[in-house]
Amino acid sequence: MLNSFKLSLQYILPKLWLTRLAGWGASKRAGWLTKLVIDLFVKYYKVDMKEAQKPDTASYRTFNEFFVRPLRDEVRPIDTDPNVLVMPADGVISQLGKIEEDKILQAKGHNYSLEALLAGNYLMADLFRNGTFVTTYLSPRDYHRVHMPCNGILREMIYVPGDLFSVNHLTAQNVPNLFARNERVICLFDTEFGPMAQILVGATIVGSIETVWAGTITPPREGIIKRWTWPAGENDGSVALLKGQEMGRFKLGSTVINLFAPGKVNLVEQLESLSVTKIGQPLAVSTETFVTPDSEPAPLPAEEIEAEHDASPLVDDKKDQV
């Protein structure tokens, strides 16, 4: 009965306006009130502030600053084995396994379309048919920055407008095609392990989705699909990210879906639905053996990457002033 009521609310509540209101409130500097809200949040969700670069809740000017707080480097060591891909986010694995032609497992007994997830881009979908997927859910208590599982060269980004259903076990079991319906940002990379997609999925109260190369992707929510492309390799304007490097973040939010090409990686055997994930821990292993490369891709420069988009670059956390 209670679950039925919760599901009904998903269709009745004005999710877009709730999300806009949450985003507005989370970005406001309210002094003691901001600190009170953060303290209550930390207590309720049992957030481990000892991992944060700034453990004192009074050091955050807005709730958003707290929510995307950077962690101390040593608390998330990155597996350095060149054959290992690492977890991109702190959270819990919702589902993982093989992509069956066009079908991805959403929950037990419920599948959704790979092509629909990729906004009908059948050429991109062809890269991942019969490949491997991992869906990672980020709870409110988790660190909400998303990192690279491996070295990658950004080739394409697609913003897909959509619904803002909550993402949790209940909705995954009961809202058909949940991840293919919600707002999302699709990022396609060239990697040593073949093409890889890393998809940031929005949800109710997700104030924004951002990337390190383009800043805020949403809002604004204009209701149209947007697409950006970047050159390959070391060409001018290319964007290279290193294994373990931050690639994006949620301001309140949600879910990361990784897609890997067929025959390229094997997921770590111990992983299963509801496995806890920590950035930098092993996620998958290459089906081929790599030696440590003599050189790595040049990391993303500190200055804004020049690309044709309307987004703003992210602020360097280490340069933030309290």
Swiss-Prot record:
Q: Which biological process annotations from GO are given for this protein?
A: phosphatidylethanolamine biosynthetic process
User: Which pathway, metabolic or otherwise, does it act in?
Assistant: Phospholipid metabolism; phosphatidylethanolamine biosynthesis; phosphatidylethanolamine from CDP-diacylglycerol: step 2/2
Comp. bias intervals (Basic and acidic residues) = 308-322
Q: Kindly give the membrane topology term recorded for this protein.
A: Peripheral membrane protein
**Catalytic positions?**
90 (charge relay system), 147 (charge relay system), 254 (charge relay system), 254 (schiff-base intermediate with substrate)
**Known cofactor(s):** pyruvate
Indicate where this protein is primarily found.
membrane
Record EC number: 4.1.1.65
**Site keyed Cleavage (non-hydrolytic): positions:** 253-254
Reaction catalysis annotation: a 1,2-diacyl-sn-glycero-3-phospho-L-serine + H(+) = a 1,2-diacyl-sn-glycero-3-phosphoethanolamine + CO2
The molecular function terms of the Gene Ontology recorded here are:
phosphatidylserine decarboxylase activity
Q: What does this protein do?
A: Catalyzes the formation of phosphatidylethanolamine (PtdEtn) from phosphatidylserine (PtdSer).
| HAMAP family linked to this entry | PS_decarb_PSD_B_type1
Name-wise, this protein is Phosphatidylserine decarboxylase proenzyme
